[in-house]
A protein has these predicted regions:
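Active-site segment of extracytoplasmic enzymes that catalyze sulfate/phosphate-ester chemistry
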Residues: 9, 13-16, 20-110, 129, ...
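Active-site-proximal cap/lid insertion segments
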Residues: 2-9, 16-32, 55, 134-329, ...
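Polar, surface-exposed loop/tail segments
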Residues: 34-35, 64, 114, 123, ...
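Short, surface-exposed beta-strand/loop micro-motifs that present aromatic residues
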Residues: 172, 377-390
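Short, solvent-exposed turn/loop segments enriched in Gly/Ser/Thr/Pro and often Arg
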Residues: 26-30, 45-68, 76, 111-122, ...
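Well-ordered beta-strand scaffold positions
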Residues: 105, 150, 384-386
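Short, structured coil segments at secondary-structure junctions
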Residues: 125-126, 167, 304, 384
Length: 488
C-alpha cells in the first residue's frame, strides 16, 4: 500500500488561498472556528513567524515549488493571462519543482485544486493526477476545472469537491508500494465571499463581532479608494461572514481528508503540511486585499505573514510552537532533507532547511534571524526587531520598529536617529538579493504593478506587454463590493 514507513512518508501538502496568519484559531483568533487545524497544530508544530516570499498568490506559489525567489523564477505577479487554450503560457517552463525531485525518488504526485502558474490545461510532468482550477479564482459553485487535460465545470461547492478528489486519490494509492505526494490547493478563503458559502458555515458567524478585523479609515494607498470603502461599509459584515465561513468550510474539508488517511492506517506515515500562499487584510490597515491591495504594493505583516502547521504523529514533536523567522523559500530544502532525498549540488538556493526543527534538534545558533520578501520593485528585509521596506527606484521607503510598534503604524525612515539602522538593513537587503537574483528576471525593473502578469518576464523587452497597467473590470475590491464571481 502507500508508504507505511515513517522515514519515507507520504506527503499531504495543503495550501489555502489568501489566509493571513491572524485567521486561525490556534494562532490566537478566538472568533474564527478552525477545530481541525487547531488539532493538527496540537499534534505537530505551529510556526508563529512564517512569511510568504511575495504577498500575492502566483509568485508565492512558484517559490514554494521551486525554492527560488520571484526574481529567480520569474513569476512576479498573479497570473492574468496564459492559463488555458492556444495562448497558454507555462511560466515555470524548464525549472525544477519539488514535485520533480520527489517523483525522481519514487513518489507518485497529484495536484488537486489551484495551480495559477499558467498552462493549467496541460498536466505538469511527473503528476499522475491533475485536477486543476482553470485560472486561479472563480465561483465556489460551478467552478471551472481541468480534469487531467479536459475542461469541465464541476457541480457542488468547490471546497468539498476538492476534498472528495483528494480522498479519491488517496484511495487509489492505498494498494501501491510507492509513497504519494498530494498537493491539495484550496481556493478558499479567496473571494467571492458574499452569498458563496454553505449556510451551515455562514450561520456560525451570525453573532460574531469581528473584533479581529478592525474597522479602520481607508489606507491612503488603498486601490479601491475612499468611495469604495464608503460603498462597501454596509456590506463589511457580509464580507467577513463569507471570509470566515470559507475558512471554516475548508477546515472541515481538511478534516475529512485527514480522517480518511487515518482510516487507512496511514497517519503515522504521512507528513501533513498546511500553509497559505500569502496573507490578507480584511480591513487591517484600512485595506481589503494583500500586497496589491495598495499602490504601491505593501509589505505589512498582515500581507506577508501566513499560517504554517506541520505534523507527522510519532516523528514530529506534538504541541510545539516555533517562533523562528522562516519563509516560503525555506520549504523546498526542508522537505528534501526531511524526506531523506539527495540535494542538487548545482546553483545555490536562498532557503535554509529547518528539517532539524521538525525533528526537535535545532540549536539556538542555527535559528533563522531574518527573512526577505519582494513584490516587483518593492523589497523587504525583516528581523525580529526591525522591518525595512525599499521601493525602487526612489521610494517611498519604510522603517518599522517592531518591538515597540508591532502594528506598523509609525514609519521611522525619515528620522535621522535611525539612519544607521536604515543603512545597515538596506545594505543587508541589497547584498542578499544581489546573490540570488537572475538579472534577466529581476523584478526591480520589470514594471510590476500588482495588476497581473501577462507573459514571461523574458519577453519584457519585446513589443509584448508583460505586466498589466491597470486592473481588469472587477478589481479585488469591486468583487467584494459588487458580489461578482469572476474577473470579466
Amino acid at each position: 500500500m502507500a508508504s507505511t514507513d515513517p522515514r519515507r512518508p507520504n506527503v499531504l501538502y495543503v495550501i489555502s488561498d489568501d489566509q493571513g496568519s491572524w485567521a486561525l484559531g490556534c494562532g490566537g483568533n478566538c472568533e474564527i472556528k478552525t477545530p481541525v487545524l487547531d488539532r493538527l497544530a496540537a499534534g505537530g508544530i505551529r510556526f508563529e513567524n512564517f512569511f510568504c516570499t511575495s504577498p500575492v498568490c502566483s509568485p508565492a506559489r512558484a517559490s514554494l515549488l521551486t525554492g527560488d525567489i520571484p526574481s529567480q523564477h520569474g513569476v512576479h505577479d498573479w497570473i492574468r493571462a496564459g492559463s488555458v487554450g492556444e495562448k497558454r503560457i507555462d511560466y515555470l517552463s524548464g525549472q525544477t519543482l519539488i514535485t520533480d525531485v520527489v517523483a525522481g525518488h519514487g513518489y507518485r504526485c497529484a495536484l488537486v485544486g489551484k495551480w495559477h502558474l499558467g498552462a493549467s490545461d496541460v498536466p505538469r510532468p511527473n503528476f499522475v493526477k491533475w485536477f486543476a482550477h482553470q485560472s486561479g479564482m472563480g465561483p465556489y459553485y460551478g467552478a471551472p476545472m481541468i480534469d487531467l487535460d479536459r475542461p469541465c465545470i464541476v457541480e457542488g461547492y468547490i471546497t468539498d469537491v476538492l476534498a472528495d478528489a483528494a480522498i479519491s486519490f488517496v484511495d487509489g494509492e492505498k494498494n501501491r508500494e510507492q509513497p504519494f505526494w498530494l498537493s491539495l490547493n484550496f481556493t478558499a478563503p479567496h473571494y467571492p465571499w458574499i452569498d458563496s458559502h454553505p449556510k451551515a458555515f455562514t450561520d456560525m458567524y451570525d453573532d460574531c463581532r469581528f473584533d479581529s478585523c478592525p474597522q479602520e479609515p481607508p489606507h491612503p494607498w488603498f486601490t479601491g479608494g475612499k468611495p469604495a470603502i464608503e460603498r462597501g461599509a454596509s456590506e463589511r459584515r457580509a464580507s467577513l461572514i463569507g471570509y470566515f465561513a470559507a475558512v471554516s468550510a475548508m477546515d472541515a474539508a481538511i478534516g475529512r481528508v485527514l480522517e480518511h488517511i487515518e482510516r487507512l492506517g496511514l497517519s503515522q506515515s504521512t507528513l501533513v503540511v498546511f500553509m497559505s500562499d500569502n496573507g490578507m487584510n480584511c480591513g487591517h490597515h484600512g485595506i481589503w486585499g494583500k500586497g496589491n491591495g495598495t499602490r504601491p504594493q505593501n509589505m505589512y505583516d498582515t500581507s506577508v505573514k501566513v499560517p504554517c502547521i506541520i505534523s507527522q504523529p510519532g516523528r514530529i514533536p506534538a504541541g510545539a510552537v516555533n517562533r523562528d523567522l522562516l519563509s516560503g523559500y525555506d520549504v523546498f530544502p526542508t522537505l528534501v532533507d526531511y524526506l531523506g532525498l539527495s540535494r542538487d549540488s548545482g546553483r545555490e538556493k536562498p532557503g535554509r532547511s529547518f528539517a532539524p526543527v521538525l525533528d526537535g534538534r535545532l540549536s539556538e545558533d542555527d535559528r533563522a534571524v531574518v527573512v526577505y520578501d519582494e513584490y516587483g520593485p518593492v523589497r523587504m528585509v525583516r528581523t525580529s526587531e526591525w522591518k525595512y521596506v525599499h521601493r525602487y527606484p526612489d521610494g517611498p521607503h519604510e522603517l518599522f520598529h517592531l518591538t515597540t510598534d508591532a502594528g506598523e503604524r509609525e514609519n521611522l525612515v525619515g528620522d535621522t536617529a535611525y539612519t544607521d539602522i536604515v543603512t545597515g538593513l538596506r545594505s543587508r537587503l541589497e547584498g542578499w538579493f544581489e546573490k540570488f537574483v537572475n538579472p534577466l528576471r529581476d523584478g526591480v525593473n520589470k514594471g510590476v504593478t500588482g495588476c497581473g502578469q501577462l507573459d514571461r518576464v523574458e519577453n519584457a523587452g519585446s513589443q509584448r506587454t508583460v505586466f498589466g497597467a491597470g486592473h481588469l473590470v472587477g478589481a479585488d475590491w469591486d468583487l467584494w463590493l459588487e458580489k461578482k464571481d469572476t474577473l470579466k
